[in-house]
């Protein structure tokens, strides 16, 4: 069900980072593991590739003869290619990760979690990474992250970071990617619970497909001290990631149990919710 549907242009467009913004990112993740810090440096190097390429491009443009029309056309083509790449490369990377879910999600719908517990080729790690990405890559999470970074932009001011040296618009995308990666590292050994819906109410999903059941979605400014991801896969199957209380499989037999999860997911959604039963959507009309 649409809730003020809108399309956000350039949602994944990579912005340039200045030296202070890179320093801020390193400071934010200073207490992470050595292995993650190595990943962080690799990410920064990759993320700033466009800046290095564009700086080289500007140098080449400056040394070309003014009347060199063929070279000028070539440079314009390169400029256009770099601009397209800034828009697409991160979204394409997300799509590659999502492509791997083609094998996992049908297995879960068949109540088969063997790929997670007994799978080869680090499938567990890649699946956890996929779930974290589904949580962090949404408009709602972006909005909340922007709010926090705007506060940092305004109040995180000192001799090391003079006012105006960091911009939320530049930071939110790399920060979300890195927080997602860090979350994946933390949850690597987390248990997976299969929720089997035996009630008369189907699971719904939304534009926030993964939620933290421990978050207060009526007030996201509240500090969150626990994390249990909930991810509906189909109207009859969902998963919990990092719930140490539940076992490997839990059957939900009452409508109230399923409705409680649906209500949480609705509160977390930003613009859209989806269901295969129209009557269920009617319950959430505002």
Predicted features and spans:
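Alpha-helical structural context detector biased toward long hydrophobic helices
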Residues: 2-286
């Amino acid at each position: 069900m649409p809730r003020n549907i809108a399309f956000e242009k350039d949602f994944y467009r990579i912005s340039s980072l200045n030296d202070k913004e890179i320093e801020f990112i390193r400071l934010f993740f200073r207490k992470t593991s050595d292995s993650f810090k190595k990943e962080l440096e690799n990410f920064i190097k990759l993320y700033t590739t466009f800046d290095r390429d564009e700086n080289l491009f500007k140098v080449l443009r400056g040394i070309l003869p003014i009347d060199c029309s063929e070279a000028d056309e070539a440079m314009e083509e390169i400029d256009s290619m770099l601009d397209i790449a800034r828009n697409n490369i991160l979204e394409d990377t997300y799509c590659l990760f999502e492509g791997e879910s083609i094998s996992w999600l049908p297995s879960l719908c068949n109540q088969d979690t063997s790929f997670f517990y007994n799978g080869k080729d680090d499938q567990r790690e890649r699946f956890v990474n996929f779930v974290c990405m589904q949580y962090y890559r949404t408009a709602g999470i972006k909005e909340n992250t922007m709010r926090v970074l705007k506060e940092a932009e305004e109040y995180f001011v000192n001799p090391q970071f003079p006012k105006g040296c960091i911009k939320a618009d530049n930071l939110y995308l790399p920060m979300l990617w890195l927080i997602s990666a860090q979350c994946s590292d933390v949850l690597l050994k987390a248990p997976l619970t299969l929720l089997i819906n035996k009630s008369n109410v189907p699971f719904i999903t939304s534009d926030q497909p993964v939620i933290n059941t421990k978050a207060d979605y009526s007030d996201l400014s509240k500090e969150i001290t626990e994390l249990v991801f909930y991810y509906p896969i189909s109207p009859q199957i969902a998963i919990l990631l990092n719930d140490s209380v539940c076992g490997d499989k839990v059957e939900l037999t009452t409508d109230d149990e399923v409705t409680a999860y649906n209500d949480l997911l609705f509160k977390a959604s930003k613009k859209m919710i989806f269901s295969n039963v129209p009557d269920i959507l009617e319950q959430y009309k505002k």
